[in-house]
Structures are given as structure tokens and as C-alpha cells.
A protein has these predicted regions:
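Catalytic cores of histone-lysine modification enzymes
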Residues: 25-118
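C-terminal SET catalytic tail plus cysteine-rich post-SET Zn-binding segment of SAM-dependent SET-domain
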Residues: 2-6, 11, 16, 111, ...
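Low-complexity intrinsically disordered segments
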Residues: 20-22
């Protein structure tokens, strides 16, 4: 199953004020964003002050589980919904932000993001990839890991992208490698050839 991170869309609460968080030293940290409705999907995180390039914005928190546990909890195809609160940390560990998660789970995907995810020491952080103005929605490229089961229909359907960027690739799945693109093009060519032969044979009979 493509690993993802779910955004709830059933209810649309009022915009939240920036939330205060305590660091490990006990100091109070005010997050540089607030959560409110987003045009991309459900709710999103919006900057409440200018954010400098390279600034560490927030840590992505949640329950740390195995891939097997995550797959048992969520089935994208069965539910007809990709679950975007799951974040792959390694081959063994996934963070499920539906359990003990924080506001980081509301940061939406974009094919032209202003943030990036960084894994350090088994922890996941969201950093600013470029200067961000007040009021701008924070985004990063989910680039969901492909497991080979995704179809072409899944790309724009189940895993379709609505970021609206000029460079939008139409899916939140990771870009296909050049080799995979060549295999897909060859398969499409074979399907077209078979369909042409079938149509011609049918006409002759």
C-alpha cells in the first residue's frame, strides 16, 4: 500500500490560534502556523508570521508502529480513501499521527512545496525549503512510496493531487523512474497494438 498521511474532511472547525508547545527543556514554543480550512484538502497549516528558509517548523509526531500494523489499520483500496496521517520513517517504522499526533499532520501536499520533510535520528521534522510569507499555506511533497500495486487509474484517482501548482504531476505518489516510465509506455503500446489487431480481425470476419 502506498504510504500516506490522512486529512479529515468531515468537519470544518474554525481556524485555530497558533498552539503553544513545551520543548524537552520545558520552554514554551509557539508554532509559526495555525490550522484552518484549505483549498487543497480538508484543513491546512498557514503561516502566522514570516518563516525563513531553513527554519525548523515542527516535528511530525504520532504513534510509532510497524508497516504491518499500519497496513492492518488502513486499507486504501478497500476504503476508497488514501490515509494521509501515516509517515514512513524507515523500512521498519511508520508514524501514525492519528494516535498522539500534533498539528504537523495538517500540512498538505504540493508538487511545488515551500517545506520539506527531514528525518534525523529516527525523528521527522518539517523545515522551510524557501522563505514563507505570513498567510501562506505550508506544504511539502508527500511523494508516497510506491509498492508496485498502484495502477495508472490509482495515480489520478485514489492518489490524485489537487495542489493546483503549475508543476503539478497529477498525483501525490512519488515520480516514476525513467525505467518505469519506459516500461509503462511499452505496455501502453502493446495494449494499443492488441486493440488494433482485434478491431481489424473483427472487421475481416
Amino acid at each position: 500500500m502506498a504510504r500516506s498521511k490522512m486529512k479529515p474532511e468531515a468537519r470544518k472547525p474554525e481556524a485555530r490560534k497558533p498552539e503553544a508547545r513545551k520543548t524537552k527543556t520545558g520552554a514554551v514554543q509557539i508554532l509559526p502556523f495555525a490550522v484552518r480550512g484549505s483549498k487543497i484538502a480538508g484543513r491546512g497549516a498557514f503561516a502566522v508570521r514570516p518563516i525563513a528558509k531553513g527554519e525548523r517548523i515542527v516535528e511530525y509526531l504520532g504513534e510509532r508502529v510497524s508497516h504491518a500494523v499500519a497496513d492492518a489499520r488502513y486499507d486504501d483500496h478497500k476504503g476508497g480513501l488514501h490515509h494521509t496521517f501515516l509517515f514512513t520513517v524507515s523500512r521498519k517504522v511508520v508514524i501514525d499521527a492519528t494516535v498522539n499526533g500534533n498539528e504537523a499532520r495538517f500540512i498538505n501536499h504540493s508538487c511545488d512545496p515551500n517545506c520539506e520533510s527531514v528525518i534525523e535520528g529516527g525523528r521527522v521534522f518539517i523545515d522551510a525549503a524557501k522563505p514563507i510569507k505570513t498567510g501562506t499555506e505550508l506544504t511539502y511533497d508527500y511523494a508516497y512510496t510506491r509498492d508496485g500495486s498502484e495502477t495508472e487509474e490509482d495515480e489520478t484517482g485514489l492518489y490524485g493531487c489537487r495542489c493546483g501548482a503549475k508543476t503539478c504531476r497529477g498525483t501525490i505518489l512519488a515520480p516514476l523512474s525513467q525505467a518505469a516510465l519506459r516500461r509503462r509506455a511499452a505496455a501502453a503500446k502493446r495494449r494499443h497494438h492488441r486493440a488494433h489487431v482485434h478491431a481489424r480481425t473483427g472487421q475481416e470476419s
